[in-house]
Amino acid sequence: MLDLKNLQNNFDEVTKKLKSKKVDENILKKLAELFASLKKEKTALEEFQAFQNKFSKELATAEDKESLKAKLSENKSKINEQSTKVNVLENELEEIAHAIPNIPDECVPVGEDENENVELKKVLNPPSFDFTPKEHFELGESLNWLDFVRGVKISQSRFCVLKNEGALLSRALVNYMIDFNRSRGFEFVNVPFLVNGATMFGTGQLPKFKEDMYKVDDEDLYLISTSEIPITNLYSGEILTSETLPIKMTCYSACFRKEAGSAGRDTRGIIRQHQFEKVELVSITKPEQSDSVFNEMLECASDLLSSLGLAHRHLMLCTGDLGFSAAKTVDLEVWLPGQNKYREISSVSNCRDFQARRAKIRYKNEQGKNELVHTLNGSSLAVGRTLVAIMENYQDKEGKIHIPDALKKYF
């Protein structure tokens, strides 16, 4: 959640940045009206309180005590009434603020959508083939690695069954990713895939993205859309010691998304599924540590791709493509020969203190004061999309898939 004091004190500057993130101008106008109303009602409340304090002190020496008591009683009623008005406005303001995204960093390019993201660099060269490379779903069906028909039969569209070496390769990737991330200093944790609403709120999924979540009927439980949610919230409501930071964690999980806005996109294959697997990185840091830790996380995910021999590129997301909780995001896109283009395989984001304010994660700084931490997250990596990338990049003209050297010991 945004710092409402900063929003109020720097309204024009902050709302300009929010507009670049495509926040509805009507919401921003409503915020301005609420701030003005709140200021007016708080001023009135302070005047009533000042009256009460002043004349309460004079009551003992007043000549007409009964008259003054009556005035104080009447004024107390006004204080109660005015306090209610202020509370109603504050609650309305906070409710609107819950649906307002994070402010983009200064370094984030201003743009409308993904077409205005900025390429930072390319890593490794895409492979060349003396034949037309196939897409992963063609390879997967011919090798009996991917069973889309039975996936749909037992579930619905956008579900798939992994079989034989395809399932083994997926499991090998999970183990390799966890080991790689641990070698970079990330502690392995295993968390629930079902979390409560407060946890979903803490990382920013609720209330704004409620319709894209799978919820358990009659219970305050949701299937996670990323393990960023439970890992970050492990420390919700806590005050950490300065010495423990940064906390760097990695986690494997299944992820569940309705993909409500993806009709017609990636309808074939396993690029976009309702259930998929991911190995995540999450860090909790002091504010002054978050930029360097962001670079560590980005380097970890990029080096992991390189260790598998997968060509990829770094993209800085523009304001219009930036996620709700993120202040800055760099995507990693892997080269897919079958599609002849780069596709997203990881997003590394710095959320600054946005999630920490919602989840109430603080630490005691060197001055002994409680301060909000910074939270960061990133995929290292999306398992299904890495499987896709290996299938397409390591295919031969006979339609066989060769296993990258780094993974051979995991079979």
UniProtKB/Swiss-Prot annotation:
The record's listing under InterPro entries reads:
aa-tRNA-synt_IIb (IPR002314), aa-tRNA-synth_II (IPR006195), aa-tRNA-synth_II/BPL/LPL (IPR045864), Ser-tRNA-ligase_type_1 (IPR002317), Ser-tRNA-synth_1_N (IPR015866), SerRS_1_N_sf (IPR042103), SerRS_core (IPR033729), tRNA-bd_arm (IPR010978)
Cellular compartments annotated: Cytoplasm
What Gene Ontology cellular component terms go with this record?
cytoplasm
Q: Which Pfam families match?
A: Seryl_tRNA_N, tRNA-synt_2b
Catalysed transformations (reactions): tRNA(Ser) + L-serine + ATP = L-seryl-tRNA(Ser) + AMP + diphosphate + H(+); tRNA(Sec) + L-serine + ATP = L-seryl-tRNA(Sec) + AMP + diphosphate + H(+)
Question: Which class of enzymes does this protein belong to?
Answer: ligase
**Which keywords are on file for this protein?**
Aminoacyl-tRNA synthetase, ATP-binding, Cytoplasm, Ligase, Nucleotide-binding, Protein biosynthesis
Q: What is known of its domains?
A: Consists of two distinct domains, a catalytic core and a N-terminal extension that is involved in tRNA binding.
Question: How is the subunit organization of this protein annotated in UniProt?
Answer: Homodimer. The tRNA molecule binds across the dimer.
Q: What is the protein named?
A: Serine--tRNA ligase
